[in-house]
């Protein structure tokens, strides 16, 4: 775990009440896909845990859904805003324990951490396949991951 100050470089809507936030800062404590960060939000007592979608040494990408006061405040942040994060929390996924053709299955806000996992599996030469089954979708705007996948080189099967 490492505490650090990060700068918002992007905070954009990708689906109904769902945003992708990119933060610049020292992400060296994040070592496995599936880990999470705790975000300190000004004026609120408790930090908010948010899973890491993707990262590298100098950046963290979070995908979050606006469901309460904390995430509502996060959704209003603009590039240049500073956030205090605890990084490298949780055990994450053991990408080395997978077979040659891992199957990644997810839904809702549980899908974003699979992006970082798939990216690392593919970099290791594995043929990761994603399967997303969407239940009770009332509006296309409520589908969380399709926009991010549109620019992704990783194959996915999406069914509604």
Predicted features along the sequence, with ranges:
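FNR/FR-type flavoprotein reductase catalytic core
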Residues: 69-160
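Ferredoxin-reductase
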Residues: 2-81
